[in-house]
Amino acid sequence: VWLFGGPYFGFWESAMAGAGAFFSNGGPIQGTASCPRKFVVMGFNYQRGVGEMLEDLGHRAESILARVWKSEDFLGYAYDRARNINALSNRQFNLFERFMLFDQIAPGKSNVGSVHYAPNSHSDYEWGIATPVQSCADDWLQFPNLPDPPNFRTLTARDWGGGDIRAHHKWWLSRLPKVPGATNGISNFWWKYFIDPNTVK
């Protein structure tokens, strides 16, 4: 369900409704348990652009995939501005967590990053800084056949749009796995989980 409204309408960027609804970057929406299926309501703002709509979808994906991979703590950490940089030093990353790595939280191990953090970002929404970074983000285009060891190469903001929100988010979404099969009991078509939350166990 897509809703469009003006500023201060109070919409969540995305919120889930229905029986068994869970957090999806907002909500869950109360009073909807009588609906037998889960569905997500997207709340868009007429004052914002397509880039922000893609950002809303990206956060929906992050939240739901974090639940699939049991990585809610990791997602919270990745967005915590007061994070302890050493907190992940001994962590064995699952595939979702590895996808989300950016240089600030995993120096030398940058993958695709998050919706707010490109592989070289130092802070939220910093998609255009010129600092080069070693990243294996393009390995994700080969999923599930991720190279071992990863193919780290030098990337810059030019690779994901030079600071353009829409270009970065399209780049990020294009690397989310979307192929047949399963790995460790989780579908290789990650999109199915955040497009249809009824597929989330």
Please identify what each model-predicted range represents:
Residues 10-14, 61-62, 69-70:
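Short catalytic/ligand-binding loop motif for oxyanion handling, primarily in non-cytosolic enzymes
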